[in-house]
Amino acid sequence: MPLLDSFKVDHTKMNAPAVRIAKTMLTPKGDNITVFDLRFCIPNKEILSPKGIHTLEHLFAGFMRDHLNGDSIEIIDISPMGCRTGFYMSLIGTPNEQKVSEAWLASMQDVLGVQDQASIPELNIYQCGSYTEHSLEDAHEIAKNVIARGIGVNKNEDLSLDNSLLK
């Protein structure tokens, strides 16, 4: 099985909240695709609650599109990481970390503006596979934490995992 790029970075050196360009690709037709690691929590020290990350998934995807999509950028997907320390965002385009960070902070402000559970998009049995597994309160706490701590940048060259540690 090939070793995925996400496992070639040293998680003990990651800062959070922080943006990292995880991967860039050029499609056969010449489109740039960028995958971002949006790290909310310090790996192995903090974790997002299941209900909080699920609610954030419903809110964050739309808010990030509101703040980041434009003529040269289109978000393909924003998905929570299995380790529950952040999200991966794949998009067409090449925004820099600062632009992504600004959109992320604005999105966290938007999350705080959601006043009640009924305002969470797609929160119903038809559009959500675990529609009872949500917490707006937890999502608000996550957003407050990101805003209070600020968003830094993780660089791949600073996180390169020593080959002796690759398994």
From Swiss-Prot:
Fe cation binds at H54, H58, C128. Its EC number is 4.4.1.21. GO terms for cellular component: cytosol. Its cofactor is Fe cation. Homodimer. Belongs to the LuxS family. InterPro entries: LuxS_sf (IPR037005), Metalloenz_LuxS/M16 (IPR011249), S-ribosylhomocysteinase (IPR003815). GO terms for biological process: L-methionine salvage from S-adenosylmethionine; quorum sensing. The keyword Disulfide bond does not apply. It comes from Haemophilus influenzae (strain ATCC 51907 / DSM 11121 / KW20 / Rd). The gene is luxS. Binds 1 Fe cation per subunit. It catalyses: S-(5-deoxy-D-ribos-5-yl)-L-homocysteine = (S)-4,5-dihydroxypentane-2,3-dione + L-homocysteine. This is S-ribosylhomocysteine lyase. It holds the Pfam family LuxS. Keywords: Autoinducer synthesis, Iron, Lyase, Metal-binding, Quorum sensing. HAMAP family: LuxS. Involved in the synthesis of autoinducer 2 (AI-2) which is secreted by bacteria and is used to communicate both the cell density and the metabolic potential of the environment. The regulation of gene expression in response to changes in cell density is called quorum sensing. Catalyzes the transformation of S-ribosylhomocysteine (RHC) to homocysteine (HC) and 4,5-dihydroxy-2,3-pentadione (DPD). GO terms for molecular function: iron ion binding; S-ribosylhomocysteine lyase activity.
